[in-house]
Amino acid sequence: MQKNNHNEEIEKEFEEVIVNIGRVTKVVKGGRRFRFTALVVIGDRKGTVGYGFGKAKEVPDAIKKAVDDAHKNLVKVNIKGTTIAHDIEHKFNASRIVLRPASEGTGVIAGGAARPVLELAGIQDVLSKSIGSNNPNNLVRATIQALTRIKA
């Protein structure tokens, strides 16, 4: 019981955003079998962010698996005030992300799957541009890897 209470405390400290839910179809002799995938980003808005990917027969189960996976993939991000310390460009598979520091009050200027990663990491002012593939899985991973490469 004690362990369960600890997990609930950890879950309360992180916010979660569902980035993508996909339906996957397997064609069998009797028809089609549907399964679902979920991509979730979690963060505490204080410099810790993570992503998770879950697959299941039902959407809520896939989301729960993705959240559990995200708790295992947490990374720490160096934040300088409300923005990042320097420009950075990172590529993951066919997705490329460019992140630039912005002056205070600019907000998070990011599209697609990069926005929840930056917001949940606690970055309030940043400019970003995604180039190439906008596949949510690759874009989330490229953004998180770029953030981990930022030097304080």
From Swiss-Prot:
Oligomeric form and interacting partners: Part of the 30S ribosomal subunit. Contacts proteins S4 and S8.
NCBIfam families xrefs: rpsE_bact
UniProt-recorded Gene Ontology molecular function terms: rRNA binding; structural constituent of ribosome
GO cellular component: small ribosomal subunit
Annotated function: With S4 and S12 plays an important role in translational accuracy.
GO biological process, one term: translation
Family listed: Belongs to the universal ribosomal protein uS5 family.
Annotated S5 DRBM domain residues: 14-77
Keywords assigned by UniProt, alphabetized: Ribonucleoprotein, Ribosomal protein, RNA-binding, rRNA-binding
Native source organism of the sequence: Sulfurovum sp. (strain NBC37-1)
InterPro entries assigned to the protein according to its UniProt record, in alphabetical order: Ribosomal_Su5_D2-typ_SF, Ribosomal_uS5, Ribosomal_uS5_bac-type, Ribosomal_uS5_C, Ribosomal_uS5_N, Ribosomal_uS5_N_CS, Ribsml_uS5_D2-typ_fold_subgr
Protein's UniProt name: Small ribosomal subunit protein uS5
Recorded domain comment: The N-terminal domain interacts with the head of the 30S subunit; the C-terminal domain interacts with the body and contacts protein S4. The interaction surface between S4 and S5 is involved in control of translational fidelity.
Top-level taxon of the source organism: Bacteria
